[in-house]
Amino acid sequence: MKISDIQTFIVDAGWRPWMFVKVETDEGLVGWGECSDGKSPHGIEGVIRDLKPSLIGKDPRAFEMRFIEMSINTRQSRWGVAAKALAGLDCAFIDIKAKYHGISVAELFGGPTRDKVRVYWSHCGSSRIRHSDILGTPPIETWADVTALGKEVKSRGFTALKTNVLLPGENATFGGGSVGGSGTTDQIAPKWLIPHIETLIGTFRDAVGDDIDLNLDLNFHFKTEGCLRIAKVLEQFDMLWLEIDMYEPYSLRQIKDSTSTRICTGENLFYMEQYLPYFQNH
């Protein structure tokens, strides 16, 4: 079996692109992979386009060998969009391997480990606060709107929600420290924001009651000092987790040791060597 073609698809998801890759073979089997970045689809597409000549004619079923070859070809740009491009292609190769054997990808790796997976409402309110016109949902302009959203979460059967630092109002947004959010771009948590976050999570808690778990995603918005203060004020709500994106494992350990709020991280790390310092220090 040989790879005969590789195609990429940048899909309009309303306010962000999704990225897919399709790998075709000379035997008719097709594999699909997903490698979205959210902001740089053309960068991922470019990496795949650059790798394509070295992959055509190779056997996709030998996905470990293909991954090593791709890693060698991108070793000067190992992370970021290059890593995401490799991940999408790797998924497509594994998809082909599973189809070749007539089994699911899960079976290829030893079978499922659970019969069901708990679902939470992710980024609850975040999309509505910026894109209610696209979604066709009510805007979030007041704390009453946050209350209504919390009740909607419960009425739709979710047992948990995750939100961001929502800033309701006429020109509502979310953020708080950087990455295009309201406020400064220096990752400092201003004095007014801490009680604001307390009100936000308290409003959700009052709306959903004690049976629904709450999560807050801070993204990369705040430095250690701000995360310390936010984690402390959230202790009263017994959060399922506070999600902090951070490339400093020692700073994250400092936050973890300072609070009873559970900390979640890691979605922006690549490969074992980036995860290892977190495992070693936590």
Where are these regions (language model features)?
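Metal- or metallocofactor-binding catalytic centers and their adjacent structured scaffolds
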Residues: 26-103
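Structured beta-strand/loop patches that form or line metal/cofactor-binding pockets in enzymes
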Residues: 1-32, 36
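Catalytic alpha/beta core domains of metabolic enzymes, predominantly
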Residues: 249-282
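Short acidic/histidine-rich active-site segments
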Residues: 35, 218, 266-268
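Ligand-binding pocket scaffold of soluble enzyme catalytic domains
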Residues: 21, 26-27, 32, 100-103, ...
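Conserved, mostly hydrophobic/aromatic
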Residues: 3, 28, 51, 89, ...
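Metal-dependent enolase-superfamily TIM-barrel catalytic cores that perform enediolate-based chemistry
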Residues: 116, 121-255
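N-terminal amphipathic alpha-helix/helix-capping segment at the start of soluble metabolic enzymes
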Residues: 1-14, 103-117
